Amino acid sequence: ITSVKVGAFTGAQNLDRVSLPSVKEVHYCAFQNAAITTLDLPWGELESIGFSAFAGASGLPQNPVFSKLTALSNGAFAGTSDNKNTQLRTISLPLWTGSSFSEGSGFSNSIGGIFAYCTALTSVSAPELQTLPSQMLYYCQALEEAVFPKVSTVNSGVFNYCTNLTKIDLGGAITRLSSAFMAYANKVTAL
């Protein structure tokens, strides 16, 4: 199996382990709100992750390095105000430039809120990313450092309520900075 299709495990309950060692694509809502003790995927081999693919899911790794990921869509790992993602600690996206996973008609290619409400996330880096999507790290209250050296556009709400964020590396070539991109991120000392 190289592709997990739309909604495949949405809302699944009481699964002890899901092991899919050859997966390259995870389509939208594939694991949304799935209660899985261990989600064994080749995180470093994934190439595309769709809309809300892992939103509200359990069994996620703490420190994934998405070595081959080139497409990432809206809400992929997001929590909510009532169901926060407390699993992810660090995120590395070495190849992602900002592309989303196009999954056909009826699917939004918006890439906002990807890690919203990931309240245990402490650091994120995406060295090739050029545009920070809206609300990408909204309410990531443990976030301390964000590294995006090639970013030129920062959309709204990216760092809102990141109350422990102290350092943002944007590389110094910003051409567009949206309003309210870091509301209540009051500890930022370097930008």
Can you describe what each PLM-predicted range is?
Residues 1-3, 13-25, 34-48, 58-71, ...:
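Structural signature of tandem-repeat unit edges
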Residues 5-10, 27-30, 50-53, 73-78, ...:
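Consensus positions within tandem repeat domains that build extended binding/scaffold surfaces
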